[in-house]
């Protein structure tokens, strides 16, 4: 009879342990994560890439540029078909984007800000903390020339997860 009174307690303890393990396992599962959005409808051509081998400081006409060591400078021609997009991305360093033809819309994850740029206008992408997507929202082709300042050997673009609060 002594064994019979402990059996329900053992069963209850086993159920409690299994329930706790199940809850812990469910909590350990990765939450739904935003996935990277690959580029589409774009073609990029590397025009040139080179290394500034030494540190330098330049201050001219309100422009200040300072490097602590070598950096790469890359220039890329990007063509956006109608609806073409870079996908959400960042750059390891700043990028100066000049719209050559057409119109390009910049969507920034921070604050879900959007701004359009026409041919002849230039905008700055700020580097690794500036998650953004650029897209041709017109019916014609848009072309850009982009100059990147990068750590030596770094890629010009790195895919980033789509921000949940900025649906496109």
Description of each model-found segment:
Residues 68-71, 84-96:
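A short beta-loop-beta micro-motif enriched in histidine and acidic residues
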């Amino acid at each position: 009879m002594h064994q019979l009174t402990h059996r329900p307690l053992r069963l209850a303890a086993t159920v409690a342990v299994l329930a706790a393990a199940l809850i812990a396992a469910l909590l350990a599962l990765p939450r739904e994560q935003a996935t990277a959005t690959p580029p589409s409808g774009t073609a990029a051509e590397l025009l040139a890439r080179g290394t500034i081998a030494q540190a330098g400081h330049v201050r001219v006409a309100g422009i200040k540029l300072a490097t602590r060591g070598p950096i790469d400078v890359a220039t890329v021609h990007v063509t956006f078909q109608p609806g073409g997009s870079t996908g959400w991305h960042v750059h390891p360093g700043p990028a100066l984007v000049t719209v050559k033809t057409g119109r390009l819309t910049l969507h920034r994850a921070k604050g879900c800000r959007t701004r359009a740029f026409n041919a002849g206008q230039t905008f700055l992408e700020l580097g690794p903390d500036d998650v953004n997507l650029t897209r041709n929202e017109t019916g014609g082709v848009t072309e850009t020339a982009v100059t990147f300042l990068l750590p030596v050997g770094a890629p010009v673009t790195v895919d980033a997860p789509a921000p949940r609060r900025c649906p496109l």
